[in-house]
From Swiss-Prot:
InterPro entries in UniProt: WD40/YVTN_repeat-like_dom_sf (IPR015943), WD40_repeat_dom_sf (IPR036322), WD_repeat_multifunction (IPR051179)
Entries under Gene3D superfamilies matching the protein: YVTN repeat-like/Quinoprotein amine dehydrogenase (2.130.10.10)
Subcellular location: Nucleus, Nucleolus
Any one of the GO CC terms: nucleolus
Gene Ontology biological-process annotations: ribosomal large subunit biogenesis
Upper classification of the organism: Eukaryota, Fungi, Dikarya, Ascomycota, Saccharomycotina
WD repeats: 127-166, 178-217, 236-274, 276-317, 365-405
Biased amino acid composition, Basic and acidic residues: 449-462
Protein name: WD repeat-containing protein JIP5
């Protein structure tokens, strides 16, 4: 009995989204979070791309405010069925954001300004004919690359949306068959000016990110099946990448010309192909990209496979972690919190936090009761972001993340200006009792004052910890470059 209770305590999550963006008229195909700014870019099945900037502190303040109102208001006055976080519908025709909830719509009419929502539209455009198939940022987030079902690759400025370069990918190939291939994945090098584009025939093309010229092609990697995922293996080399497709994992160097898979009859092939997993390999990531000693892959039958490149050079999985039977793990991203964990998006509408070291699920959050989770990402402060065809949710930081931010700050020379220990349970209880006796207007005023003070301190704490992590990341990147002896982009 005790064991069952412990298991329940581990996986239950009380975290809520701070923002939900919905598309009630067009399917969402892709979403990206800027690495250094509170910016989210969304691609749609209609070919539209929309860029939004959000204010995490304001959105968190709104969520906390609704929580306190629910706690402080008596039962007879409590509002049933009111969503505590902000939910906005994206209008692709005008670019406007509209509240989904009726009560919030009435408040928006009084203010009439998008910035009061904590979210505003920076730009929108009809970028592609047909659907948006894939998107990615460059290493600094200054530009965004997108490819559509029209086979046109476009490079645009992130802040303005203005296209600075474009190319019809079909014009780069001589074969008629290759001209008709559709593209599935984009991946940008973090150290050199090139991007990789995977297609439905198992080919990966290397494109110069400056002039969008074709540099190399690695063909038929997964026996002609579609490329499901591509990611960097820069711990080995700036030119090493991993791709997933069909039931195999492949490991290759983008500089190799006419590279062939190392299969039976061609053992000298330069593309290293894993053993057949007898289950479709849909997505993958390193638990810690800077260490790159553990790789997790999401599978079609609801499990995550664990790979150790230092043990068997990615020939086969080492173990597996059960997530959800008869469901598929469609997307995966590391938490980047030094906790040996990743976030997995599942076809049942849940996102799972999986501890690779313990080999089990440690947290579950529900993204949707009706829609599957088709992509997960992290924002600039490491909030997890989940998305499906109908909506995108930016989740609040968990208590573990907040504690880590505090521990990072306490290691610095600056003294802590605020601590959770300063607030006793008795004080919190007294505040709640006092608030119950106030009118609704007085209650809201008091809550607003408290939240402004709380989130100013939280914002300062988060900014310091994020800045420190980014400095550490840049130092590690420079170290990797020095170790590999890479100084310039010679071979591509």
């Amino acid at each position: 009995m005790a064991k069952s209770k412990k298991k329940t305590d581990v996986v239950d999550s009380t975290n809520l989204p701070i923002l939900e963006l919905l598309s009630l008229k067009a399917p969402i195909f892709q979403s990206l979070l800027h690495p250094e700014l509170p910016i989210i870019i969304t691609g749609f099945g209609t070919g539209h791309i929309v860029c939004h900037r959000y204010d995490p502190a304001k959105l968190q303040s709104h969520l906390d405010r609704r929580r306190r109102i629910d706690t402080a208001t008596t039962g007879k006055d409590a509002k049933k069925g009111v969503c505590p976080w902000i939910r906005l519908d994206i209008d692709l025709e005008t670019g406007d954001l509209k509240f989904v909830d009726i009560e919030e719509q009435q408040q928006q009419k009084q203010t009439g300004k998008d910035e009061d929502l904590g979210v505003k539209t920076l730009w929108k455009t009809k970028r592609h004919k047909g659907s948006v198939r894939a998107m990615c940022f460059d290493s600094k987030g200054d530009n965004i690359f997108s490819v559509g079902s029209d086979n046109v690759l476009k490079k645009a400025n992130t802040m303005t949306g203005k296209v600075v370069k474009k190319v019809n990918l079909s014009s780069l190939f001589n074969s008629e068959e290759k001209k008709n291939d559709k593209f599935t994945k984009l991946c940008a090098s973090q150290t050199h000016p090139f991007i990789l584009i995977g297609d439905e025939s198992g080919n990966i093309h290397v494109i110069n990110s400056e002039n969008l010229a074709l540099s190399n092609s690695i063909r038929s990697i997964h026996f002609g099946d579609s490329i499901n995922d591509i990611f960097h293996f820069d711990k080995r080399s700036a030119y090493k990448f991993i791709s997933l497709g069909q039931t195999t994992l492949a490991y290759f160097d983008v500089r190799d010309k006419d590279a062939k898979p190392n299969v039976a009859g061609n053992e000298d092939g330069k593309i290293l192909i894993s053993d057949d997993q007898e289950d479709e390999v849909l997505c993958g990531c390193f638990v810690d990209p800077e260490v790159a000693d553990t790789l997790l892959c999401g599978m079609g039958e609801g499990i995550v496979t664990v790979w150790k490149p230092n043990k068997n050079d990615l020939e086969d999985q080492m173990s597996r972690i059960k997530i959800s039977k008869d469901e598929s793990i469609d997307c995966i991203v590391p938490t980047l919190q030094d906790d040996n964990c990743v976030w997995c998006g599942c076809s049942n509408g849940n996102i799972y936090k999986v501890n690779a070291k313990l080999g089990k699920v440690v947290e579950i959050r529900n993204h949707s009761e009706l829609d599957e989770v088709s992509f997960v990402d992290l924002d600039f402060e490491y909030r997890v972001v989940s998305g499906g065809l109908e909506n995108i949710k930016i989740w609040e930081l968990s208590s573990d993340d907040v504690e880590e931010n505090a521990s990072v700050e306490s290691d610095s020379d600056e003294p802590l200006s605020h601590s959770d220990e300063d607030l006793s349970d008795d004080t919190s209880s007294d505040d709640e009792t006092t608030l119950v006796g106030l009118s609704k207007e007085e209650l809201l005023d008091e809550l607003d004052k408290d939240l402004k003070e709380d989130h100013q301190e939280e914002k300062e704490s988060n900014s310091k910890s994020v800045k420190k992590r980014k400095i550490m990341k840049e130092n590690n990147k420079k170290k990797d470059l020095y170790e590999h002896g890479i100084k310039k982009f010679d071979d591509l």
